[in-house]
Design a protein with these regions (language model features):
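Conserved ABC transporter NBD signature motif
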Residues: 69-79, 87
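Conserved ABC ATPase signature
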Residues: 145-149, 153
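The feature captures the beta-strand-to-loop junction immediately N-terminal to the Walker
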Residues: 46-48, 358-360
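Conserved ABC ATPase "signature" region
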Residues: 123-141
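Conserved catalytic motifs of ABC-family nucleotide-binding domains
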Residues: 166
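Helix-to-loop junction immediately C-terminal to a conserved catalytic motif
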Residues: 61
Length: 364
């Protein structure tokens, strides 16, 4: 396959200076990193804070230049200033905070901002805007103000702005770090669809293990170096090494490892809930079969039937402390607040409701 990114012995050195400009120390934020990314791949780069992953990401878009070593994007050297324009069109970049990337007051105008600066004809700009917003599921919000969108929606608009530039790959530097779980799910699902349906190369910088588990290949960074690399199964099977450098593993991997300590026969490369359940079923065939039948019955229930069954179970047990339904958080001041209340709150005597005071929810 064609290599879209080629990194060879890349070093990026940060220099510390005192108030007078004298050098007081040096540190290799990226230290002799070599890796290749093939066209159409979904790559995840993992690492704790200070591992060098974000510094590496900024080299791919030529925001930073190597101290030594080489980095080529579509065969063009990022260290050659004559290539910067082409490289930044080939490798789009999305950052943590979508508010730092959105500059226009209307969604569609923001998405069209990049192509407009390239001198693209107006008719072509609007075609790109419509296509990009459609690919990220935000076409119905094209006339909205970004300030009225959720964090996940804003990040999808930021991704659409990059797509409108027609890049060959998108580098995303922890794009879900500031989002709630629902927003994270929206963004990651968008990235998967872009990769699988549109064949866009994705390079995802993240510290969320479940996000990395969706990638084709993972590179784990520690102290500026590549500590581990391979498929998600290969990387997360190195449980002890991951823990040693201060990183977690997917929840299913963690559970499987814990069960293994108690003598269960669990594979080292479990990374998904389905794999975990299959392995548990093999260890406890009779119990697992009954549980599977029960899950199938629950899956076939309607939403209303599930709600009624769960409510009755909660009422009978008396163990539920708090259960929320239809709770909303609205970002803009001029939007009507839906009623938000606690449906059930049981612990023998405790029963409360949520009341709204201006823009603050409080228990009363």
């Amino acid at each position: 396959m064609q290599k879209i990114v080629q990194i060879k012995d890349l070093i990026h050195k940060f220099v510390d200076t005192d108030a007078e400009g004298n050098v007081t120390g040096e540190k290799n934020a990226v230290d002799s990193v070599s890796l290749d990314v093939e066209k159409g791949e979904f790559i995840a780069i993992l690492g704790h804070n200070g591992s060098g992953k974000s510094t590496l990401a900024k080299h791919i878009n030529a925001i930073l230049m190597p101290t030594s070593g080489t980095l080529y994007v579509n065969g063009k050297d990022t260290a050659d200033g004559r290539n910067i324009w082409d490289i930044r069109q080939s490798a789009g970049m999305v950052f943590q905070n979508p508010d730092n990337q959105i500059i226009e007051t209307v969604v569609e105008e923001d998405v069209g901002f990049g192509p407009e600066n390239l001198g693209v004809e107006t008719e072509e700009i609007w075609k790109r805007v419509e296509s990009a917003l459609g690919k990220v599921g935000m076409l119905e919000f094209r006339k909205h103000s970004p300030s009225r969108l959720s964090g996940g929606q804003k990040q999808r608009v930021a991704i659409a702005g990059v797509l409108a530039m027609h890049p060959d790959c998108i580098v995303l530097d922890e794009p879900t770090a500031m989002l709630d779980p629902h927003g994270r799910q929206e963004v990651i699902q968008t990235l998967k669809e872009l990769n699988e349906k549109e064949k866009v190369t994705i390079i995802l910088i993240t510290h969320h293990m479940n996000e990395a588990a969706l990638a084709d290949k993972i590179f784990v960074m520690n102290e500026g170096k590549i500590a581990l690399q391979g498929t998600p199964k290969e990387v997360f099977s190195h449980y002890d090494e991951m823990k040693k450098i201060g990183l977690d593993v997917p929840v299913s991997t963690e559970i499987a490892h814990g069960l293994k300590k108690y003598g269960w026969h669990m594979p080292d490369d479990i990374i998904s809930e389905e794999e975990l359940l299959d392995s548990i079923k093999k260890n406890l065939p009779e119990k697992a079969e009954k549980d599977t039948e029960h899950r199938v019955e629950q899956k076939n229930e309607s939403k209303a039937e599930q709600d009624n069954r769960e409510a009755q179970q909660q009422k009978d047990s008396g163990e539920v402390i708090l259960s929320l339904r239809d709770v909303n958080y609205i970002y803009s001041a001029d939007t009507v607040y839906p009623q938000a209340c606690v449906k059930k709150c049981q612990s023998g005597y405790l029963e409360r409701r949520i009341y709204r005071s201006n823009r603050t929810y409080r228990f009363g």
